[in-house]
Amino acid sequence: HILIGEGKCHSDHADFWVGYDATLKSSPILVYGIFIFGLFLTGILLHSHQHQGSASFGMSVFNLGNAIMGSGILGLSYAMANTGIALFVILLVAVSIFSLYSVHLLLKTANEGGSLVYEQLGYKAFGMPGKLAASISITMQNIGAMSSYLFIVKYELPIVIQAFMGANNGEWYMNGDYLVILVSIVIILPLSLLKNLGYLGYTSGFSLLCMVFFLIVVIYKKFQIPCPYTVMLLNETVSKIQNISSGSINTTAVDYNEDVCTPKYFVFNSQTVYAVPILTFAFVCHPAILPMYEELKDRSRRKMQGVANVSFLAMFIMYLLAALFGYLTFNVHVEPELLHTYSKVFKADVVLLIVRLAVLTAVTLTVPVVLFPIRTSVNQLLCASKDFSWIRHTIITIGLLASTNLLVIFVPTIRDIFGFIGASAAAMLIFILPSAFYIKLVKKEPMKSVQKIGVMSFPSPFGSIPLICLWVLRCLLCQA
C-alpha cells in the first residue's frame, strides 16, 4: 500500500484538505440523511416485491441487475490499469458476451431438463457428482462474495472513523482486522442468526443504488483530481528508495521517468493475469437466473432472455464507466479496491465519506443475505433429514462467519479474492457447468450438431484459468 506523508504535502493539497476538514463538521447531518434515504429506498423495494411469482419485465431487470452487481465493480479499474484500455474493453466484451450466452444455455437446459433449480439440473445431468459440483461452486462463490464485502469493511471503516476522530495514532479501533471482527460479532452475527431473512432479503436493491451513487462520484472526481498526484508520487518514491537501500528491488514498480498521467492501451505485466478472473467474478449471477425465471410474469424463455440482455447491457455500461474513469483518475496508482485509492488524495471529503458510509451499510447488511444460502446448503448436505435445531443453526453460522473472517485477515488483498474465486467458482458457474448441463440434458440436438460442437469448445479456455494463476504464482515464488 502507498502511505501518505504525515503533514508534509503539497501546499495546494493542504489548502484543499483544510477546506474539506471545515466542511466535514457539518457531515453528521449528511450521514443521517443517507441512512434515512437508504431506509426509504428499502421500503420502496419491500413494496415492490410483495407479490412473488408475478414480477414484471422492469422489476426482473432490476432484480437481475442486483444479482450481477456486487463488489466486483471496485476491482475493475485495477484490471484496466494492468491490461490497458483497449485490451480491457476486448476482455470485457468477451466475458459479457460469453456470460450472456451461458444464460441462454441455462434457460434452454432448464426447459429441456424440467427443473428451475441450478443444483437440481446438476443432479439430473450427472447425478450426485453434478449436484455436488454445482453446490460447491455456489458455496465458494458466496464465500468469496462475503469475503470481498468484509474486505471493504476492513479497508473503508478505518478511514470513516479517522474522518470523525481525527489523526491515526495507532489506536486499536483504527486497525481494520479488529474492526472486521467487531462488526461481524456486533452486527452481522445477530442478523445472520435470524431463522428467516425477512426484510434483509431486499437490501440488495439498496446495494445496487449505492454502487450507482459510487459510479457518479467516480466520474465527478475524475475532473476534480489533478495529475500528477504529488502526495502519491512522493511516498512511492520514498518507498522505492527504501526498497533499493534494503536490497529488495520490486521488478514491477512503476518507472518514474515515464509519463504516469498518460493512459495506456495495451499493458502486459505479472498482474495482467488477474483481469479475466476479476471480470468473471463481476458478471457471475447464474444461480439467480432460474429463480427469477420462475417469478417472471407470463414467463417464456424469450422474455427472460430479453431481461438478461437488458440487465447485462446496463451492467456492461456501468462496469466500463467505473473502470475507465477510475483508471483515468489514478492511472498506474489505482489499487485493487478503487474506493480505497481515493484516501491517498483526500483525507476528508464529505461526498466520499457519504459514499463510504452508504457502501459500508450496504455490504454489512448484505453479508447475512449471502450467508443464508450457504448455511442452507450445509444443512441440506449434512443434516437433510433432521429437524431444525438452534444449536446446529448457531454453530454453522458462527463457523462460516469465523472462517470468512480468517480469510479476510490473512489473505493479503481483495485482489486475491477476486482472482481465485473468479478463476474457480465463477468460471464453473458461468462457463463450465451450463455448457456441461446443456450437452447432457438437451437431447433433441445431436452431439455432432454445430450448437453442441460450439458449446464443447466454449468452456475450454476458461477452464484453464486456475492453471494459469497457479503457474504465475509459482513463477513469482521462484523469482522470490
Where are these regions (language model features)?
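Intrinsically disordered, low-complexity regions flanking or connecting the multi-pass transmembrane cores
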Residues: H1-F410, L429-A480
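Membrane-embedded helix-loop-helix hairpins and adjacent transmembrane boundary segments
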Residues: L407-R415, G419-I421
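Claisen-condensing/thiolase-fold acyl-transfer catalytic domains that form or cleave C-C bonds
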Residues: A426
